[in-house]
Amino acid sequence: MEFDLEFFRENNFVRKQCSVCSSYFWTLDDKRSTCGDPACNGYSFINKSPVYKKYNVDEMRDEFIKFFENDSLPHKFVEPYPVVPRWRDDVLLVNASIYDFQPQVTSGLAKPPGNPIVMSQPSIRMLDIDLVGKTGRHLTSFEMLCHDSFNYDDNYIYWKDETVRYSFRFLTERLRVDPLLITYKEKPWFGGGNAGNALEVFVMGLEVATLVFMDLKEDKNGDIELEGTRYSRMPLRVVDTGYGLERLVWLSTGTPTVYESIYKRSLDYIIKNSNAEYVSPEIMARISEIAAEIDPYSDELVLSRINKTGDKKFMEMLDNIRSAYGLVDHARTLLLMFSDYVIPSNVKVGYLARMLLRRSFRFMEKIKFNGSINDIFDAVYDEFNKIIKNYDKDFINNIIKIETEKYKEMLRSAPEIIRKHINKNTISNENIAKIYDTYGIPLEIISKVFKDLTNKELDIPENFQEYLVKLHENVKKPEKTVKDYPDINTRPLYYNDTGIMEFTGIVMYSNGNEIILNQTAFYPEGGGQPADHGYFLYNGKKIEVLDVQKYGNSIVHIINGSIPGHSRIKGFVDKERRTQLMIHHSATHLLLGICRAYFGEHVWQNSVKKDIDESRLDITHYKKITEDDIKNIENMCLDAIMASKNIHVKNIEWNRAISEYGFRLFEGGFPLSDTIRVVTIDDIDSEGCGGTHLKNTKDILMLKIVSTETVQEGIQRIVFTAGPAALRYSQKLYSIINDEQEYLKVPPEKIPEQSIKLVRENIENKKMINSLERELAEIYIKNALRIDDESFYIKSNEILSRVILKYTGARNGRFIINTGSRIYISSSYNDADVIASMLSNNYSGSKRVAICDCNANENLIKEILVKIKR
């Protein structure tokens, strides 16, 4: 048995099989028949708290942390990580405390920040968003309390027995829970590419913790298979515990729902300033108890069990309090997102933020909240300021102002958008998802507008919001081309000295036009920086280096030719190209730091691309960059260049780097390594980077922004050039200005004025020409030869024929215009192409307008028209 532990044996725990779900569990109550899961025996703690006193969230957090900090084996307290995990690219949000240490620590690459550790990690899980406010227990954000240990072959900390012992001691010694009320349910665990056995901890039906014993990692070649996925043993064993802070607080208060236990002050504020009011505690407690036993949740079933189906007055009250619950929950989640400067948008984590905001706006409308969402943020922040560390009100106010306008515009356009997607008096689930995703129209508004338009109810599945969240939380990592190369461990000379442009190496591997050396000064493509070019000298011949790529520890050179293995060769890096790329790379870091200083701390690097002539930097920013912004940023960059700021590069141990520089380190990605190569420009920017850099900002020489644009909501692109490339760009602009000056016959400062003048004159001239054309066409049409009641014949030249044709298109009748070598036909009877085909084999056009090569007189045309009318 996986959990035949000394702790269980010495305390006389018994292992039983649940009479309801058949799972195995451990208990001190030998008469117990159920595992403690609410689906098996429901809640019994509401109004009967087993905890000796009531805690609030701050008190419970402190109680937990101090218990482990002051233990005989002291646990190191670790400050919470951000909720946006910029140290990994496979998830959008931190769902649990272990996310902080995947994959670097759990893979064995990096050491943990302490061992053992204790922390309280804010986490966001959006999958249950449909259930928030309904079940009494679901939240989109929560704090996961944890005490974790990382066990290595040469450093054992603690494993299953000690972990269970800790959980039991905390519950019984600190919270004074009756030991007979605690059950440990056996259950396998999977998450984030790892797996292991686990115990779920229940008290009176409430799951208060999960104790995970992680020792497996996903491995397609692994020898262990669990639920269709293959695993292999990890290089270390990790104790990953998760105690729900809010659940423990709820257990201590025994309130009807979790919301009253953790959001009491915020809820009171909302109820005081809205139409919402508390529903009877007895009824809310009953709803929570029934909801705990139902999986999947059904609102209809819950309401039928409390005998409230069809009670409109009660349903309005219930709907209002649920909206208030949703408001406080969403406000805390949004504040956590905003503390990490998430900008609402239609993609990735921004999509989830906008979803929460628009649901919040809708809740406020339903309960007629007398105030703004900022007021709610203030109230919630007052309750949770110990965990929401960054409350940037200016940033939040700007975001809310923009999002409120977008929400109003969405409401204005919603009816027409929804109307277009109605087919046979319904809207398919696919189109509902499209309306929500593309236009951001909440499901409730889709339902309301649909009913207004069709007088019918729209059937939207209860968990549809969960389906939408899954679509956006499913992060697809870019597939990397995997090639089979030997692990040569090429020594990179470009890090030791970026000035090395010549070197000697030995060919360790050769296959066609690909070679791997023992060492190289050629920088491989990576971090948005293109590969170096140059050549090798072999047997007196120059062999061009076309590309350089890194696969694992091997640096592969793609060459224009072949060089046999074991050859000793000399390499020459294209110095001009490398220097320009170094300038653009260092300039990118400078520009990012300046943009953050200028716009605010919400600026993060979204993506970059460096090149020879120009580079681009995409940053997070919620407004379009103006001309004034560009000038100010350029001036600030110039000041930094002229100030000769030093650029430092150093390798720092993973945890120390995070401690010293924070999570800005991961703006350009993250290394799968135990160290981070940190590039710092004095007091301007620090980030992890594997690229080549200058030693001082003065070597950037100059920086010029070429263009800016909004590439998607919340993302601004800056295209810029620096160094010699900036000089070439300026010279090109000067050449263009010089040509314009010559052409316009004005000095440079008058070019804009003269250009505007010419454009206006051109517009006026076009208007005049159009007027003259219309008058001339009218004269020809008026004097046209009438062939019959419907048809007219006009003789003209080629240029005038096209003008006349333009003004006959909107008239009734057939107009045949002869130029002498070509005939144009305009017909409101949709037979222009037929007439053209009868006049000539060489014709083209449509039913309305056609053209053919011929010189037919009016008599021939009369004959053809007679035939057509038959």
From Swiss-Prot:
Localization recorded for this chain is: Cytoplasm
CC annotations in GO = cytoplasm
PANTHER family for this protein: ALANINE--TRNA LIGASE, CYTOPLASMIC, ALANYL-TRNA SYNTHETASE
Q: What is its EC number?
A: 6.1.1.7
Principal cellular location given in the protein's record = cytoplasm
Q: Which residues form each disulfide bond in the chain? A: none
Origin species, per record, is Picrophilus torridus (strain ATCC 700027 / DSM 9790 / JCM 10055 / NBRC 100828 / KAW 2/3)
**Which positions does UniProt annotate for Zn(2+) binding?**
585, 589, 689, 693
User: Which GO MF terms does the UniProt record name?
Assistant: alanine-tRNA ligase activity; aminoacyl-tRNA deacylase activity; ATP binding; tRNA binding; zinc ion binding
GO terms in the biological process aspect are:
alanyl-tRNA aminoacylation
Enzymatic class: ligase
Note the SUPFAM superfamilies from the entry: Class II aaRS and biotin synthetases, Putative anticodon-binding domain of alanyl-tRNA synthetase (AlaRS), ThrRS/AlaRS common domain, Translation proteins
What UniProt keywords are attached to this protein's entry? Aminoacyl-tRNA synthetase, ATP-binding, Cytoplasm, Ligase, Metal-binding, Nucleotide-binding, Protein biosynthesis, RNA-binding, tRNA-binding, Zinc
Family the entry assigns:
Belongs to the class-II aminoacyl-tRNA synthetase family.
The UniProt note on the cofactor reads as follows:
Binds 1 zinc ion per subunit.
Under Pfam families, the record lists:
tRNA-synt_2c (PF01411), tRNA_SAD (PF07973)
- Enumerate the NCBIfam families for this protein: A-tRNA_syn_arch, alaS
What's the name of the protein?
Alanine--tRNA ligase
Tell me the superkingdom of the source.
Archaea
Q: Which gene encodes it?
A: alaS
Which cofactor(s) are needed, names only?
Zn(2+)
